[in-house]
Amino acid sequence: MEQEPILNEHNKQEYPPMHTAEKKTSLIRRGIVFLLLSLIATNASAQDRMFPSKVYANEALRGYETALFDYFNISKANKFACLVEPSYHGEYCLSYNQRDNLLILKRAKKNIWSEQGWTYPLDSQLRNPGKKVDAEEYSLRISDSLADSLQVMFASAILTSSLIGDTLGGLGGVTYQFMLSPRYSSWGAVCWSPKESTNCGQAVAIIEKLCKYVETGDKEAAENLIGEIVRVTNLFRQYYPAGYRHEKTFCI
């Protein structure tokens, strides 16, 4: 028979104490609800900040990164570069050559990780990384204003990167590495397949548009992105500490 509620001296209802099993079930349910709500809240904002540059403990991944840096001549870029790593298509890199005011797009015709990381032995990959994959290369001369606005956007995204930022990676998808001064010290941050509405997603959209315009030689369309670049820069700047004024971009 169901137990009647007990009335205390204040005429308030008190219910019989739950058994241990009931308590555990209740706690588990509350925990599940809390986790679901936390995931919803996290997913809503996690991709608004990038993740600091990756550090590889795995030899194969270190070899892959070395292969990409060599293949795309990233060490020769100055000001900034964005390395794009799709899981199943050819990797590509958008970089800036300050001496000639050129945006340079180099796109591998095959996925270097698949061609070198899986097909060939690891020691071969490390000795001769990425040399067998053909590439297409394009360049577009841009204004100092566009170059400077891109440099500041990269700096803002990188300086506000956080270990509690975007998901670092997953199965499938695309990884974007944003780098400052890769020729010298390479400050960097990454994001992985960000949603379009997030700060990272909007920064990635700018990179993809620029890749398209460099490939098609559309200088006017590229220059018209300055306003959008400034807007996205300000989105990242919202994460600056109170009172912080970003005057330098740590670039050479």
Where are these regions (language model features)?
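N-terminal secretory signal peptides that target proteins for export/translocation
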Residues: M1-I28
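Short, linear, compositionally biased motifs with a strong N-terminal bias
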Residues: H10, L37-S38
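Function-determining sites in protein domains
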Residues: Q47-I252
